[in-house]
Structures are given as structure tokens and as C-alpha cells.
Amino acid sequence: MSKLSGKVAVITGGAGGIGRAAGKLFAEAGAQVLLVDINEKALNEAVNYISKDKVSYVAADTSEPDEVKRFVDEAVRLYGGIDIFLANAGIEGELNLIIDTPLEMFDKVMAVNVRGVWLGLKYIMPEMNKRGGGSIVITSSTAGVRGSSMMSPYSTSKHAVIGLMRSAALEGSGMGIRVNTVNPSPIQTRMMRSIETQRLEVGGQTFSTVEDIQEATAESSPLKRYGEPEEVAKLMLFLASDDSSYCSGGVYMVDGAVTAGRTS
């Protein structure tokens, strides 16, 4: 039997990168998958890429309560309930010093990266409780376990969802709901490309091209490379499945030992 046979998974930020990779892996493992993203064109492409038979989508803003209620209701209408929630929607914001970051940018990042996750938990946990439990996986980041210069809103948000995860893991324990975070970086995604492009723009003469930044980033990793979205998705599949039945409240790094320390 497939790992997720008979399960229903909701994946936010599902139109590309890690979310799309997880959607494909979850569907291949037997789950019915509802992808959620604000980009409807990319969602349609993701569904065609994965499987029209196993995957549906809802275009929604995950930071708005009515929008979250709408995609939760749609998952229940289509599939009868929710067993797995991958809270993956997130934005990086604009790179800047704290003193130069507009309050509006801070609020925007926190709305998507923290409020959106909290709303998902608020409306999905009751549905999981009706089915006797479930698994929630929240995408954090290496920026959630250490500081990140020029990215204070993003780093703050990724620290915050770890605290949120731990609270949800405690509250969910009585409902049979497990909650964990996955903390990736550097991963070959659109968000990573955006961060690298912004670093080039604000980095003065340190780097000449985005390729220079990518080379330096890969070289700084103990494994000397970027991770791929599929490598992150494989851990998410483990945490979503019953194979991880005693895993809850955990922070799982997918970073090629970047946060482990220095090699020399």
C-alpha cells in the first residue's frame, strides 16, 4: 500500500518549488491533493504537471481568513476531510537593513508567513480532529534558527512559525495531530533566485553576477551544492505519513549541514 493511500493533503504555496514537488510526491504516494496558491496560472500548470486525476487547486490568499475558510471548505467538499496540511506559502520580502525596511513590508511578510500559517491551523485542525488526527508540516527555513542580515522580516517570520509549531504540537496531541517544521536552504527555487538577485542589487561590488552569488553559496555549504525541491519534499512525505508516527514538535533541517557549524 502507498504511504498516503486514502489520505487528503492540502498544500499552500503549491504552485511551484517545494510545494509543487511535495504535491507530486504526495500524489504518487496515494494522496488526493489540493494545491493552494495566489498564482492561478501557475496552479493550473502544476496540476497538469502532477496529475489531473489526483490533484485539484484553489487560488487563494492564505493571509485572509475568508480565503482560508474557502479552500478548507473546498477540500472537505471534494474529498470529505483533511488528513495532511503542508503550510508552505511564504514570501521573502525586500532585502534591506532594519532601519530602512518600511513597516508595510514587515507587515506584509508577517501576514503571509505567520498569520497565514496560524489561520491554516485554526481552520484545518478541527477538520483533522473529525477524522481522528492528522499531520501538519510547516515550512520554516534556516533563517528560522539563526539571524539573516538584510532579511529581518523573513527571519523573524521563520522563527515565529517554529514557536507556533511547538504550541500547535502540544494542543494537537490530544486530537491525534502531529505538527513539525522543515527548515530548508539553500534550495533551487524561485524564492532563492529572487533573494540572490536582490543581494546582487544591494551588495555593492562584492559580486558581479547572480552566478557569482550562486557559486559562493554552493561553496559555503559543507556539501558544496544547493538542495533540490524534491529533496525537501521527501522529508515532508516522511513527516506527513504514518512512518513518522512518533514525530511531533520537531525542527527538521534540510540544509546540507549549513547550520551545523564550520568545516574549518
Write out the residue ranges for each language-model feature.
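Short C-terminal tail/terminal secondary-structure segment
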Residues: 3, 92-95, 236-237, 248-264
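Residue(s) in the substrate-gating loop at a strand-loop-helix junction
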Residues: 141
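Alpha-helical segment proximal to the catalytic Tyr-Lys
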Residues: 126, 170-171, 245
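Substrate-binding pocket helix/loop in short-chain dehydrogenase/reductase
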Residues: 96-98, 102-108, 217
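Short, small/polar-rich loop/turn modules that mediate ligand/substrate recognition or access, typified
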Residues: 173, 178, 247-249
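Canonical Rossmann dinucleotide-binding motif of NAD(H)/NADP(H)-dependent dehydrogenases/reductases
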Residues: 3-34
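Active-site helix of classical SDR
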Residues: 121, 157, 165
